[in-house]
C-alpha cells in the first residue's frame, strides 16, 4: 500500500476523501507526507490502525491539509500529544476526530489545544485514552460548544466535573459515552438532567420555534457502578429519546445491576398496558 500511495497521490491533487484503513499496517510517514504535499483539498482522511506512523505524518498534514474536516487516526499508537497539538493549531476546520486508542497523543495538554483551536468540532472519540482527565475534557466543553458526540469510554481519570462542564456548555450534545468511568457519581447525572430543564428557555429563544429536537439520544453508563436508580431515572425522564425498552436501547446500563429498575417512558407504558389486560379465569 505504501508504494501505491507514493505513486498515486501526485496524480490526484483534487482528492477530498481518502480511506487508508488497514488490517495489516503498511503505511509509513513518507506516504502521508506525499499526500500532504499534493492533496491540499483533502477533507476526509482515515489512517486508522496505521501504527507505523509517527508525528512526522501529523506535522505534514498540519501544513499540507489545512482543510481537513474529518480525521480518523484511531489505533495510531505512536503519535504523541505534541504532534496532535501541532495538528490542531493548523487544522481548525476539524468537525470529526477519532482518537480511540491514541493513548500517548490524547492528553490534557493536547485537548486544551484542540479546545482552543478547533471550535467547530462536533464529534470526538477518546475511547480508552486513559491519560485524559478533567482538565482536558473541560477545555473541550468550554472551547467546542457545538460538540454533539463525545466518547469517553475507558477514560478512567475523569470525574463528575467533566460531565458537569459538558452539561452546562455543550447544549447540542446528543451522544455521550462514559463506559467504565467509575469516578462518575449521581452528581454528574443530576447535572445532565437539570441542564435539560435549565436550558429549555435559552434554546427556545435561540432557535425561534425550532426548539432543539431531542437532547441526548445515546448515553452509555455501563460499569459506572457508583450510580443510583433515582439519578439515572432523572436523566431518562429529562431526555425522552433515551430508551431502555427492547429493540431501542439507547441508555446503556449493562454491568450496573442496581439500575435494573430504571425505565424509559415507553417501557412504563408497555408495562401498564400489559397490567391492564384482563387475566384469564381459572
Where do the language-model regions lie?
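The conserved beta-strand core of Leucine-Rich Repeat
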Residues: 1-282
